[in-house]
Amino acid sequence: MKKNVHPKYNEISAYCSCGNIINTKSTLNRNLNIDVCHLCHPFYTGTQRILDTRGRVNIFNKRFNLSINADFLPIDKKLNKK
């Protein structure tokens, strides 16, 4: 068998934008910056919020003239039948 074929397994830190620091191991040689973690992700916290780091949601809403609190009416299936 060949020797030294596996990469080194280093201890790194993952820094979340909420301030949480996660210590883990990886083959990377650098620390990570992440947007969400288990403490701030909407699935785990049970809250709904929009994570928009580049203004993409505002651009989309502006382009299609949508507001965040718009009431969407269900499409009547009877009108689509011929």
Swiss-Prot record:
GO biological process: translation
Lineage: superkingdom: Bacteria
Cofactor: Zn(2+)
Disulphide-bridged cysteine pairs: none
Gene Ontology CC annotations of this record: ribonucleoprotein complex; ribosome
Molecular function terms from GO: metal ion binding; rRNA binding; structural constituent of ribosome
Cofactor note: Binds 1 zinc ion per subunit.
KW RNA-binding (keyword) present: yes
Family: Belongs to the bacterial ribosomal protein bL31 family. Type A subfamily.
PANTHER family: 50S RIBOSOMAL PROTEIN L31, CHLOROPLASTIC, LARGE RIBOSOMAL SUBUNIT PROTEIN BL31A
Protein name, per record: Large ribosomal subunit protein bL31
